[in-house]
Amino acid sequence: MQMDNRLPPKKVPGFCSFRYGLSFLVHCCNVIITAQRACLNLTMVVMVNSTDPHGLPNTSTKKLLDNIKNPMYNWSPDIQGIILSSTSYGVIIIQVPVGYFSGIYSTKKMIGFALCLSSVLSLLIPPAAGIGVAWVVVCRAVQGAAQGIVATAQFEIYVKWAPPLERGRLTSMSTSGFLLGPFIVLLVTGVICESLGWPMVFYIFGACGCAVCLLWFVLFYDDPKDHPCISISEKEYITSSLVQQVSSSRQSLPIKAILKSLPVWAISTGSFTFFWSHNIMTLYTPMFINSMLHVNIKENGFLSSLPYLFAWICGNLAGQLSDFFLTRNILSVIAVRKLFTAAGFLLPAIFGVCLPYLSSTFYSIVIFLILAGATGSFCLGGVFINGLDIAPRYFGFIKACSTLTGMIGGLIASTLTGLILKQDPESAWFKTFILMAAINVTGLIFYLIVATAEIQDWAKEKQHTRL
């Protein structure tokens, strides 16, 4: 904790400061791209000219079928699956390249242009659907790549903008936007479809994205030293706190050292574990509610949105508490990271395993479902920002690699869960949550043993070797 003692004793503003304002701006970017990605999942119900027996049929949908504001398309379930998954391909392909280039090129330009592209493509989805399926797939794939740029490149921001004792708060504030976006989509998409037609969903979220993009180019700067509006005291506070970590010199990426680093593998394993449980809770919560509670579609949508809201709250709480423990010297950095990672892995496992045994009580199922889906966001104060501790110079690349590993875990989890539900419906939920708990515990054990918060040798400045 020697680095903490180097921080300037002069107290600077917190939530009224520019660094927190920029973190909130990134939060808005994340809300937008998540909303643009998730809205098609719901609008697909009223875009197709057939009713999926496992989907969302109801009387309001029948009314929408007769509304000229909602064009209908004869897309088979297979075509719908291709369209819905096309975004993921773009995100996966772009991860590692963005992680590399975000440490070289301007983060402001990368995120700004990517957000603009994603928003413009959102505006083009309705006309693309009228032209043909191929155009929708292309738009969604490119949009996924653009959203992947925003989601990955943003972590490079905190290398120069986040003081060590404020990393938890700043990163959790911004990344919690990924959780608030789906909550907003679940609340407003149905209303927009009923009143204005499904194309307006894409137009509204696309227009909001363009507006946020303009704010981004005006307000954000890659380095606090270059920002014309930041106060001198805040600028000195940030630069002084990061003087031991941030350097303007650019060294080649030590790929071999990164691949051999056990702390990096601990972070990647943690990401794999998090996305495994997160994807299960995200994709299968509506199905679980339908099978256990037998509610109508409107109630299902409302109940499905609650875990996102509480996850947003838990994520921000994790950031506040993690920095509180560090600021008061209650715990070391690695103790804080392991504590919140343990909470983010164990609590969803415990609440998830209890869910299949609560079939007779409505409120207990809802409460445990919310807790199982929300408490995983405690990882925002743990493994999610651990890469910034061990290798701030290469945080963007490490975050990209760990996110890619996590997305693979999420893909395996969603596919395997689908097979379990199909082959053994009676005990499927028990098997699903037991497997999720086993993955969470295994991933946590590995992380607790291997993880560290010390800057790795391969991530340190090597300027003396050039003299």
Swiss-Prot record:
Transmembrane segments: 81-101, 119-139, 178-198, 200-220, 257-277, 301-321, 339-359, 365-385, 401-421, 433-453
Catalytic activity: 3 Na(+)(out) + phosphate(out) = 3 Na(+)(in) + phosphate(in); urate(out) = urate(in)
This protein's record includes keyword Glycoprotein: yes
Residues modified by glycosylation: N41, N49, N58
A biological process term (GO) from this entry: urate transport
InterPro entries, per database record: MFS, MFS_dom, MFS_Na/Anion_cotransporter, MFS_trans_sf, Pi_cotranspt
Keyword annotations of the record: Cell membrane, Glycoprotein, Ion transport, Membrane, Sodium, Sodium transport, Symport, Transmembrane, Transmembrane helix, Transport
Primary site of residence: membrane
Membrane topology per record: Multi-pass membrane protein
UniProt-annotated location(s): Apical cell membrane
GO molecular function per UniProt: sodium:phosphate symporter activity; transmembrane transporter activity
Tissue expression: Expressed in kidney cortex, liver and brain but not in other tissues.
Gene Ontology terms: cellular component: apical plasma membrane; membrane; plasma membrane
Keyword Cell inner membrane attached: no
Matching NCBIfam families: 2A0114euk
Function: Important for the resorption of phosphate by the kidney. May be involved in actively transporting phosphate into cells via Na(+) cotransport in the renal brush border membrane. Plays a role in urate transport in the kidney.
Family: Belongs to the major facilitator superfamily. Sodium/anion cotransporter family.
Quaternary structure and interacting proteins, as annotated: Interacts with PDZK1.
Name this protein carries in UniProt: Sodium-dependent phosphate transport protein 1
Organism of this sequence: Homo sapiens (Human)
